[in-house]
Curated annotation (Swiss-Prot):
It is found in: Secreted. Coiled coil: none annotated. InterPro entries: Spider_toxin_CSTX_knottin. It comes from Lycosa singoriensis. This is U8-lycotoxin-Ls1q. The lineage of its organism: Eukaryota, Metazoa, Ecdysozoa, Arthropoda, Chelicerata. Pfam families: Toxin_35.
């Protein structure tokens, strides 16, 4: 009987620890999601990539996105 109670308490402690750890993890950002203010939150299969925005030769801002690793994006005219 004591063994069953002990096993139940150990199981409860393990489940509680797993739930607490999951609550503290930040959800990752999916592909093409803007991550300018959260650079480390892209999902593990994605990379953080930034692009400068220019007007009349002067930089007016910066956009960052979560993009696929190894993919090259080119501007279309």
């Amino acid at each position: 009987m004591k063994l069953m109670i002990f096993a139940g308490l150990v199981l409860f402690a393990i489940v509680s620890l797993i739930e607490a750890q999951a609550e503290h993890e930040k959800p990752c950002l999916p592909e093409y999601k803007v991550c300018t203010h959260a650079p480390g939150n892209c999902c593990s299969d994605l990379v953080y990539d930034c692009y400068g925005r220019y007007k009349s030769g002067a930089q007016i801002g910066r956009n960052c996105f979560c993009l696929q690793k190894g993919v090259i994006y080119k501007r279309e005219n």
